[in-house]
Amino acid sequence: MPIAVLALGITQITAWGTSFYCLGVLAGPISQDTHWSRGFVFLGFTVALLVMGVVSSAVGRTIDRRGARVVMTLGSVLVAGGLFALAHVHSEPAYLAVWAFLGVGMRMCLYDAAFAALVQVAPSRGRTAISYLTLFGAFASSVFWVVGHALNQRVGWRQTLVLFAFMNLAVCLPLHWLGLSRREAPRGEATPTGGPAPSREDPPLEGRTRSRAIVLFALVMSLNGFVFGVVSVQLVPLLEAAGLATAAAVWVASLKGVAQFGGRVVEMLFGRKLRAITVARIAVGVLPPSLLLLMVGPASLSLVVAFTLLMGASQGVITIVRGAVPLALFGSKDYGAVLGAIATPVLIVNAASPSLFAWITDRWGWGTGRMSLLAGAALAWLAMEIMSHWYEARHREGVSASPAHATATPRRRDARPR
């Protein structure tokens, strides 16, 4: 597993940085060179997210059938081809079409595919591997915004995208193919005494119960996706509307990445002692109070910093939860298809949320906009609590009805080992 985590860690930094985050530093140069509005430039990214949502279930099923190794390797080829094509577009329709093509490749390369790959490579250690992998991903924007800015200064945005395409072929493609070539047989994690460790999670859900749980968890992630979709694009304007000057808003917004990384480290150190669904309840539950900090009166720097740190930590842990909870509730069987089904509404909401939030603030102001974020976070928390209590009740019913529970008898006091 360490080889797979390291390989995927490198590819996640590269794939996220060169595709998902590339407009962070290249949108301005593209707009200036082509005379397209920045809004139109970012519309391409919205198209990619929508396509990712549309193809998500199909990609997930293909990962289960063909293996993540094949899908992610092909995804590297598609991302490279899309970036190369993007470097040569000169018309608006072609620009949007290339982003649609990139959306397919991105869905085959980014977190959901990588989570499924780790579960296929190391079924017994999937949750731990997912936690480690997200630590790598936290550096993607930091690394490639610097790299992209430097390359654009030297060779321009078109050649920068060509170099990004080459990185996907030279780095991601071989690492996906070679790093995912070995799988361990499913087994329990070893204890210090050498025996299998008892599972911290309950048996996977089946049948109608499984379907209902998938719908509930997809609802939780979609409601959170609305909040994080807005924050990812409009955090600086949100902080400015709270009363910060632009320079201060940019500085505070930069703390979000630090908080994401910190949240993931805390989950790795302490979250292993908790069930995945418990970690999810904590991460989802932190978000509404953090948003309240923006609404308690005149904003102070300390309150805004506290909001950013809590929100960032929540987002960082929820990235892990998105892969760990389905593994705990539904098991490794058809894991790729389950992630694909959950990701479909999440990605579509992510794509639509910045525009929807902009419409809300333009029509009713920033106060109503903040209320919409709080409502989304509160509904996500409520849905998470309903899901958790429902799941616990179903589990207790299953345990009390199980033959082992009904027929178990205590060992006689006078029994002797033979």
Identify what each model region corresponds to.
Residues I30-S31, T62-I63, V146-V155, L239-E240, ...:
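Interfacial helix-cap and linker-helix signal at transmembrane-aqueous boundaries
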Residues I13, G82, P93-C109, S222, ...:
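Hydrophobic core of transmembrane alpha-helices in multi-pass small-molecule transporters
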Residues I30, M108-A122, V317-F330:
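Intracellular juxtamembrane helix-capping segments at the cytosolic ends
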